[in-house]
């Protein structure tokens, strides 16, 4: 679980449903869990109305069965909802509505993501070979600098999320780890070796700890 997911799961009266992550980093299998919840809560007479934020055709069967138990289903979408919701799911719901940008901005804001500057590389004459030891030292310095820069760009909400993640886990939270590796690989113009990843993640932890204690 990511730090944000852990924070949500720890909230009162909240059930977090997670599927599995496929090879492309996509989460799958959540729809079936939502359908199961819909059916079971309706069958147990634990709910009378549902607000469903979805557009997937796969949840339609859950809507149908819940309605058979007398539950009213209110389908919610984000503008333009018709472009992201299944037409048959919209037809199945008892009511449909959508939130526009102004409504969403009342409780959500777009977090800026640090984008490393792209440096144009001009063609240049071939250079003399650089000793491997010097190259490794240079890369190690860039890796450490990348970790410091990455942590410096984190917002207070990010630091709080990492703190929550570290209560039950170790290392770099998944939602930060991928970005950290990608930005560092760009700085050294190659993929990191396993030993370099350990250095990077260790420095990340050190820098986050400094910011939290500073």
Swiss-Prot record:
Keywords of the record: Plasmid
Gene Ontology MF terms: RNA nuclease activity
Domain of life: Bacteria
Name of a matching Pfam family: NYN
Protein name: Uncharacterized protein y4oD
Source organism of this protein record: Sinorhizobium fredii (strain NBRC 101917 / NGR234)
């Amino acid at each position: 679980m990511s730090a944000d997911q852990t924070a949500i799961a720890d909230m009162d009266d909240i059930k977090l449903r997670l599927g599995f992550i496929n090879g492309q980093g996509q989460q799958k299998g959540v729809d079936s869990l939502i359908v199961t919840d819909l059916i079971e809560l309706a069958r147990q007479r634990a709910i009378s109305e549902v607000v469903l934020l979805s557009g997937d055709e796969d949840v339609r069967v859950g809507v149908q069965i819940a309605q058979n138990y007398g539950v009213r289903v209110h389908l919610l979408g984000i503008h333009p909802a018709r472009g992201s919701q299944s037409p048959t799911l919209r037809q199945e719901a008892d009511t449909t509505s959508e939130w526009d940008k102004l409504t969403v901005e009342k409780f959500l804001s777009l977090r800026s993501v640090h984008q490393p500057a792209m440096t144009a590389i001009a063609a240049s004459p071939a250079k003399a070979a650089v000793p491997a030891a010097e190259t490794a030292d240079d890369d190690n310095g860039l890796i450490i600098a990348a970790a410091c820069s990455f942590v410096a760009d984190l917002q207070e909400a990010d630091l709080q999320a990492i703190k929550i993640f570290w209560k039950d886990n170790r290392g770099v939270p998944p939602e930060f780890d991928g970005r950290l590796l990608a930005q560092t690989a760009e700085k050294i113009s190659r993929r990191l070796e396993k030993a370099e990843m350990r250095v990077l993640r260790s420095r990340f932890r050190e820098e986050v700890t400094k910011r939290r204690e500073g």
